[in-house]
Each structure stands twice: as structure tokens, then as C-alpha cells.
Amino acid sequence: MSAPEDLLLELGCEELPAREQMPLQDAATGIIGQLLDAAGLQFGSIHGYVTPRRLALWIKDVSRQSLPQETLRRGPLVARARDAQGKPTAAAEGFARSCGVSLDDLLTLETEKGPVLAWREVGTAQDSHALLPEIASRLVTSLPLRKRMRWGAGSDSFLRPVRWLLLRQGGQVLDWKMFGLDAGGESFGHRVHHPQAVRISTPAGYAGSLLQAKVMVDFAERRAHISGKMAALADEMAVTPILPEALLDEITGLNEWPVVLAGSFAADYLRVPEEALITVMMQHQRYVPLRGRNERLVPHYLFAANLHSRDTQVVIDGNNRVLRARLADAAFFWDQDRQISLQTRRAALAGVLFQDGLGSILDKTVRLQELAAALSPQFAVDAGDMNRAAALCKSDLLSGLVGEFPELQGIMGGHYARHDGENNRVATAIAQHYLPSGRDDEIPADAHGQCLAIADKLDTLCGFFAIGKVPTGDRDPFALRRAALGVLRIVLDAGVPLNLDEAVTRTLAAYGGAFARNRTEIRSAILDFFQDRMRVYFREEGFRADQIAAVLSRQPHEPLDARQRLEALALFQAEHAAADALAALIKRINNLLRKEVISGDWPIDPQYFMDPVENTLWDYWQALEQPLHAQLAERRYTAALGLLAGLRPAVDQFFDGVMVLAEDPVLRQNRLALLARLQEAFLRIADFSQLQGA
């Protein structure tokens, strides 16, 4: 058998979207491994490469022959293989004939339906050169692309038009045809610095050959290069770069041969709010803003050019011109927008549709006024401030700056509110009320912003659920999952004891009689949706599914309280050796009480205790009851569980010493009533019967 050889696959294409490059590389490395496994080809490590113009895979030590593929074929039941006279049936003979063997050569295989006739076929090993072209094509068609393109006369599709193919194992170029192209043994270098073909002699030499052709194919190495060069240049300039991970990834995805340079703009533009300047630089130009030692923006920025110019100043001047035009627009809108107050703009919101069936944006602000003011006590903020902030929070949607840069909604509203003379509390609430807009965004830092943000998200959630615009499967066109997650994150991270049932009920009430559907049904659907989000959120925080089920069955509507119970329960189970035994004991109590009926609020009468163990448990409970209820009232669940854990010896003795289901109905009711007290205490924290091992 030939020794294994490295495999190299490359698709050369038009510029790939920067944000989709790493997901594409990750998907390709995962899929190629699955395809090689399925084909019976053994292999070593997989290295993925991606640049704006290529996706490549280097797989080490791919075997030259596949492992023999074994196929197990199943035939008729053994009981139906012969007739009453012992002669083979037509079904049995037909199966043997299809396998190319005699009936006596067939195997017997045990199955759920009983023993069946079977035949195990072992295929022959195949040459990897014959298998790999088909594997390469299947890789391309299996990639989970957001959108596929077709070009020319062919039917093959990819994220961008493909211009060349490369498929080589060891020293052999393989016969791969796709996109109307034949794979060769060549790649191509940098579009400007080395547009000629680059001969790739071996898979291991791929990255080095392209480096000589001015292409850094390794995304991680290219990223580290850009980060290091920017840090060094910023250090020389005595500034600090504003370089989030996502921006660094995007810059990396825009460049094959990154050269880091510094540009500048007129200091007069610094009068524009820095959020607008940062948005223009980062999100529209992919430039890196800079802060000086006083933490304020400076009129300089960093950027990566995708080439090494003989005259770098020409490149810098070109980027400066582009940025100057964008900043001039921002400054113009900033000056113009402040001439009209948010209050004046508000009336025009009546002409801006929020959603069919839910009225205008002005209607939404009216609902938010009512809801934010109602929620204000839970955030310890003034209802008047919240009413005012809610009234004005959407007015900046009609401003020129937000029209040009929609991502500044809310943020610019806060600046305009301050300019209009609104107090800082109102301005801050307006500025922060869209947060968190993404999974990794910070929540509003101020209680006023938190209150208005939750009101805004609840109004959206309740409205869309009411008109039947509910997320289904992977589809969530109105980002309702994100809105629900935003509510949960604010409540949990800010420590707000919000009751979702009450909040949703109040939100639906603010819509008045606008809905044809039954409001109770809408409310139930929204609360179920929140419960699903809580399960996912708490799982991501590391809690077990059974712990979450145990807690949410008792506290489904207060996320903060639910998390406090979860933390106490998880700690209790981790630190108490007898936690599982206690849970099993509680399950036994639950089972008894589920089968028996306790007459009303049956009082416990010690005169009916027939055994000392009953007195022991009753005395322990009486001593425990008051401090336990005090801990539960203060939501000190860890301390409460510690107290309840002390019940276990007395409960064990109780079950060992008495027959709970005594024939005497008075004794039986007395004992069941005592157990019901214990059950009720545990249920005030969680349903322990849902815990694993209980």
C-alpha cells in the first residue's frame, strides 16, 4: 500500500464578504473531515485558509487507498425463509440471488422484529485519486452559504464567482471539474503585486509559495500581523486604538497583504458627538479611531491598505478624502438636526408606520409613556422622567443624522435631548433604550435606560405576538428572540425583580382593544416564549436542564428570583453529599401526597401521634418553621436549603417508624398533613422530584 500523502484543495474566487470568511473556513474544515471519513479515507490534521480571494484546505496524511467499505444487507425474517415443508420460500431465494450467494451462505441477524437473513458485503479498496474529485465537489455543494450565486452557463453555485481550482494530493494534480473549470496545480498571488499564476509544488509548500506572491493565506496569522502593526503604530503616536474583535476580524477579511497606515482629519470635526465619528470610521470605512491620553478622540485614525505602495502618502491622502466627505455629511446633519427639537419632531411620527395592525411610531410612544411610568417603581426612577423620555425616545428617527446612519438611533436622541434642555435622566434613558441591540452588547448602564429599554422591548414583543407574527424554527424576521433575550439580560444583569406575568399583562393592556385574538391566549403564548428563552439562557450559564425544570415549575415569571433559586440549588447539590438522598425522600413524599387526598387544610394534632418519631419530626419542624419562612421571605435560598437539609434524619426515622397510610383515617390524615407541610416548604424553592436521581 502506498504511503499517505498531503491533500491541498483551493477555490479561487472574486472577493468574499469579510464577515463570512471565518464561518466559511470553519464549515469547510468540518465538512471535509466528514466526507473523508464517509469515503473510508484516513487523514491527519486539517488546516483551513481563507482570504478575500480564496478558500483552501490542507489535509495532512490522506491515505492513498480507502478502507474496504462493509455493507450489511437485511433480508426476510428467518421464520419466513422456508415453508411448512422446509423448502426455501421465493423471498428467501430472491434475497440470496440478489446477494450473489446461495441460501446456505446467508447469515442470521438478530433484530427487534426477530432473526432475519442477512449478508455482509465487503467492498474493495479504492484509489484516493478516484475519490477525491467527487469529495471536493460534495464539499462545495455542502457548504452552508447564506446566499449562493450562479454565473455563466453552468449550474454550479458558490458565494462568489469561482475563477480557478486547485486539487493536489502529494505531487499529483487530480482531475476535478467544477464551475466549468479544470483544476490545475497553480494558484494566483496578490491581485496587484503578483497577478501571475503561482506554481504549488506540494501541499505543505502552499502557504510559503503564496507568501512570496504577497498573500498571507492564514487568517489567524494575518489578523495577528494587523493587530501587532496597529498596536506598534499607535504606541508611536501615543494614542490608544479603538479596535473591537469584530472590527479586527473584518479588516483581516478585507486584506490579503495588509499594510497598516495612519490617516488624519480636520480637528473641527471633533465637535460632532464621538459616537457619530466612531460609527463613520468603524462601521462605514473600517478605520480604527484613536483616543488620546485624555480618553478623547484625536483627529487621526489607523487603517489597513491591501497593498504596499511606492508612495504611501498617496494612499493616505485618498483615504483622508473619503473620510472627509463622510464626516462633512455627519457634521452637516448634526448642525441641521439641532434646529428642530425632539418635541417638535414628535407629531410627525404619526406618519411613520410601526407595523400593520400596531399603529404608528407615535402610537408606540404613547404606549411606552404608560408602560415606562408603570414600571418605574421597580427601577427606583421617577415616573415623570420616564413618561417624558418615552414620549421623545423615537423622535430622532426623523433626524438627518439617524436617517444617514441608522445605527445611531437612540444615541443621537440622547444628544438632541440634552441640546433641547431635557434633564440628564431623560436624555440618558433615550440614549440607552435600544440596548442591548445584540447578543454581546452591554445592557443600559443607567436605571432610566433599563426601564425604557424593557418597556420598548415588551411593547414590540406583545404587539407582534398579538398579530400572529411569531418566530418559527429558524425564522425570526422581527428579532423577537433578541428582544426577549434583551429583557432577560437587563433583568438579570441589573438585578431587577421584574415579574414578567405582570409586565406582559400591563403591556397588553396599553394596547387597549386593538386585538381580535383573546388577550389571555396572547399572554400565555408570550410567557411560554419567555420560559423557553430562560431555559436556553440558564443552560448557557451552566445550570443543568433538570435544575432549570425544577425551578421554573415553581417560579416561571421572575427571572431574577429563578436564577437565585438555581444558584442556591446548584450549590446545595454540589456541596451536600446527601442532596440526592434528600431529593429522593421528597419525591417519596410527593408520591404519597399525590395518591392521597388531604381533607381541606387539615390541622396537625400531636395527640394523634402514636410513635416518638412523629413527635421528633413535629418538634423539629416547629423549631424550623419560623426561621425557614424568614429566610424564604428574604429569598435567601441557600440558607433555607441548609435548614431543610437538617430535616432528613427526622424524616428517615419517620418513614422507618410509622405506617403513613394507617388504616385509621384520623392517623392517616394527621401524618399526611405533617408531610404536606414539608412538601410545601420545599416547593417554595423548587420541585425536587424533577431532579435527576430523585
Curated annotation (Swiss-Prot):
GO molecular function: arginine-tRNA ligase activity; ATP binding; glycine-tRNA ligase activity
Family, per entry: Belongs to the class-II aminoacyl-tRNA synthetase family.
Protein name: Glycine--tRNA ligase beta subunit
Alphabetically ordered keywords of this record: Aminoacyl-tRNA synthetase, ATP-binding, Cytoplasm, Ligase, Nucleotide-binding, Protein biosynthesis
Family annotation (Pfam families): DALR_1, tRNA_synt_2f
GO CC field: cytosol
Stored PANTHER family: GLYCINE--TRNA LIGASE, CHLOROPLASTIC_MITOCHONDRIAL 2 (PTHR30075:SF2), GLYCYL-TRNA SYNTHETASE (PTHR30075)
Source organism of this protein record: Acidithiobacillus ferrooxidans (strain ATCC 23270 / DSM 14882 / CIP 104768 / NCIMB 8455) (Ferrobacillus ferrooxidans (strain ATCC 23270))
Subcellular compartments: Cytoplasm
Chief location of this protein within or outside the cell: cytoplasm
Domain of life: Bacteria
Gene field: glyS
Quaternary state and interactors: Tetramer of two alpha and two beta subunits.
EC number of this enzyme: 6.1.1.14
Known catalytic reactions: tRNA(Gly) + glycine + ATP = glycyl-tRNA(Gly) + AMP + diphosphate
BP term (GO), one: arginyl-tRNA aminoacylation
